[in-house]
Amino acid sequence: VSDLQIPLNHEVATKNVIKLARREKFDSVLVVGDEIDFQTISKWSEGTPLAYEQTLHADRELTQSILWDLTENAREAHIVRSNHTDRLYNTLLKVPGLMNLPELQYEKFMDFATMGIQFHKTFYEFEKGWILAHGDEGNTNPNPGLTALNLAKKAGKSVVCGHTHKLGLSAYTEGVGANYRTIYGIEVGNLMDKKQASYTKGIANWQMGIVILDWDGKNMTPHMIPINKDGSFTALGKSYV
């Protein structure tokens, strides 16, 4: 699942991805981070009316509801840290006396344990040789797939990430003759409503999408699923409109 940044998510696209998750009952649901925007506690809101909007509780409840709908039919669910969810910790840094309160640790703040979601503070290797990351751990590249591939080269393993809001796959092969290996960098797009992303001023090289991964116990086959601007898409032979 790509960056939602709730409550700035694309409602139709989100509902359709939930329909897909309920229909397919995936073994695992992986969320690349930025599931909640935390816009009222961002550094960009400081000194603006946004910082005084009392929406944090409602945003959290909506995020919990959407994550539950996305993951309730899966055997397991995982989320990795991200720059937007780090905003809670960054806010606590301004009041260090609150930092050790367990209820203000992000995974407890979101009550992931009750939902059966496992939160990872760093890379998560979800299958052998395949890592889930957010995508902000290295330098970003304007070309879809290359931010993930650069992370993959550093990690020595294939990487699935978000952060760039781009949908793309790139690969790198090394070796001699028949003795070679290929690693992949996959960026999963985003599920944001671009109209609500006012900071882009309406112009952004973003693509909505998700990725479905098939693992046969040895090899991974990625299926890139582009999502249209109206929130519709086709996946695994079925259209969601």
Give the positions of each predicted feature.
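A generic local structural motif
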Residues: K15-I18, S65-I66, Q118-Y124, P144-A148
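Active-site metal-binding loops of divalent metal-dependent hydrolases
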Residues: S2-Q5, G33-I36, N83-T85, G135-E137, ...
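Polar, enzyme-active/binding microenvironments
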Residues: N9, R23, H223-V241
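Short, basic, glycine/proline-bearing loop/turn elements
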Residues: V1-Q5, T48-Q54, E127-G135
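Conserved beta-sheet core of the metallophosphoesterase superfamily
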Residues: G129-I227, G231
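Acidic carboxylate-rich catalytic motifs and surrounding loops in phosphoryl-/glycosyl-chemistry enzymes
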Residues: H78-H84, F119-T122, H223-I227
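Core catalytic region of metal-dependent phosphoesterases/phosphodiesterases
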Residues: I6-T114
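Short acidic low-complexity segments
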Residues: F109-G129
